């Protein structure tokens, strides 16, 4: 077993960073994309202020999220061909397609090309957490998952900062072209990425049945998988619009400057680091389930604050929302992986990706339609309240799961 700060875990965190840089480009540059392919009007509707209607943006982002369903079979391939192979292959392909999106001739072309890169990068993110769990013991596991989440967050934050400071020089096309840098760095990162011993031991065990990549999960695991997937669905109903529309809301509607947006992202990065540290401690001392529940409630409340209509509310809500999501990440990542044995763990991660995609699609379309229907005035605030708060109810499902704090996966599933 490795410690959370050993090179194999750091290597996986760097892959998560690269995936975050590639995936978050559509979010951070959405304002520029809307201005390039849309039309800013003089009215006060969402479309006049943003450049494209809330429905158009919501549907476009929903398509990007739906494309992530392709991450389900790709993540499942890690149960057949190994964690290392799939991590490196999916990250490389996803980043290459992100670079290609820079040449998009129109909005729907942009959506189509960028959507092709979503499945491999989603698989990278999902399998990276699986590998981190398998590389570490119980005492190090929440720390390792927190490091993976931090890596993804840093990658996403870098995209947002670069866009905020250099959008006039680079435009959205330049932002996407920068994904070539982490693509090149994969040559160095791959030296640190190793196959977890838990997986290699499973490969040598000829008594273990090899299941189809997207085959049915064994009956003993289906109840837990259904509960975990429903919780992931609820979380994503919140995070889909809360994270995906916040920068176009800041830049095109609230008219926040690039420097202020960068400051908001840096502040969120600091808060996110604090949230990860707090979440890691809470996961190991308070428990996985209550920590996840608290994170869900915080994301909903602070997400609504971010869209409440004022710049201070936007900045404060975004920063605190990132902190709440970071509190959730170590506990949620550990819980979702500790509940299932090694032979199906990557496939389960794929099903969780699918549940998250469906939740995000529901949230994005609901938010976009509500913002358009509400017309003038504080349309985003109305959409946020109606979309976010009901999703908190999914947190109650956590208490149908066993608490995994302080336990090895083998203690929960002897087949693991």
Where are these regions (language model features)?
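Extracytoplasmic gate region of multi-pass secondary transporters
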Residues: 27-28, 222-273
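Extracellular/periplasmic helix-loop-helix junction of adjacent transmembrane segments
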Residues: 30-68, 259-260
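Central cavity-lining transmembrane alpha-helices of secondary-active solute carriers
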Residues: 59-75, 266-278
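Conserved MFS/SLC helix-loop-helix module at the cytosolic interface between two early adjacent transmembrane helices
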Residues: 69-105, 286-289
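Helix-loop junctions at membrane interfaces in 12-TM secondary transporters
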Residues: 102-113, 169, 307-317
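Cytoplasmic helix-loop-helix junction between adjacent transmembrane helices
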Residues: 113-150
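Glycine-rich segments within core transmembrane alpha-helices of 12-TM secondary carriers
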Residues: 140-167, 352-364
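C-terminal transmembrane helical hairpin of 12-TM major facilitator-type secondary transporters
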Residues: 283, 287-332
């Amino acid at each position: 077993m490795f410690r959370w700060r050993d090179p194999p875990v750091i290597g996986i965190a760097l892959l998560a960073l690269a995936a975050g840089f590639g995936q978050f480009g559509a979010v951070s540059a959405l304002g520029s994309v809307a201005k390039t392919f849309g039309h800013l009007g003089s009215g006060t509707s969402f479309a006049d202020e943003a450049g494209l209607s809330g429905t158009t943006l919501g549907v476009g982002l929903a398509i990007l999220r739906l494309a992530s369903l392709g991450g389900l079979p790709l993540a499942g391939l890690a149960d057949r061909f190994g964690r290392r192979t799939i991590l490196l292959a999916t990250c490389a392909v996803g980043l290459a397609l992100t670079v290609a999106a820079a040449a998009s001739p129109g909005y729907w072309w942009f959506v189509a090309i960028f959507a092709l890169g979503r499945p491999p990068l989603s698989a990278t993110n999902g399998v990276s957490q699986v590998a981190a769990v398998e590389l570490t013991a119980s005492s190090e596991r929440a720390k390792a998952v927190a490091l993976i989440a931090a890596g993804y967050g840093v990658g996403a934050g870098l995209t947002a900062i670069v866009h905020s400071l250099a959008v006039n020089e680079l435009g959205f096309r330049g932002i996407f072209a920068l994904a070539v840098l982490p693509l090149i760095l994969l040559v160095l990162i791959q030296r640190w990425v190793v196959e977890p011993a838990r997986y290699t031991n499973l490969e040598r065990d000829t008594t273990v049945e090899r299941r189809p990549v997207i085959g049915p999960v064994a009956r003993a695991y289906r109840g837990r998988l259904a509960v975990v997937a429903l919780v992931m669905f609820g979380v994503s109903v919140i995070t889909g619009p809360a994270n995906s529309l916040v920068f176009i809301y800041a830049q095109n509607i609230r008219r926040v400057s690039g420097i202020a947006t960068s400051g908001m992202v840096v502040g969120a990065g600091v808060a996110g680091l604090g949230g990860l540290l707090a979440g890691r401690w809470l996961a190991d001392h308070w428990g996985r389930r209550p920590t996840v529940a608290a994170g869900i409630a915080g994301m909903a409340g602070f997400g609504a604050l971010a869209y409440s209509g004022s710049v201070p509310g936007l900045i404060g809500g975004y920063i605190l929302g990132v902190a709440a999501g970071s509190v959730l990440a170590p506990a949620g990542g550990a819980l979702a992986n500790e509940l299932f044995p090694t032979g199906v763990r990557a496939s389960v991660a794929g099903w969780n990706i699918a549940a998250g995609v469906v939740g995000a699609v529901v949230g994005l379309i609901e938010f976009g339609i509500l913002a358009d229907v509400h017309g003038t005035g504080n349309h985003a605030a109305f959409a946020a309240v109606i979309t976010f708060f009901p999703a908190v109810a999914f947190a109650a499902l956590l208490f149908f799961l066993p608490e995994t704090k302080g336990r090895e996966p083998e203690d929960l599933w002897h087949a693991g």
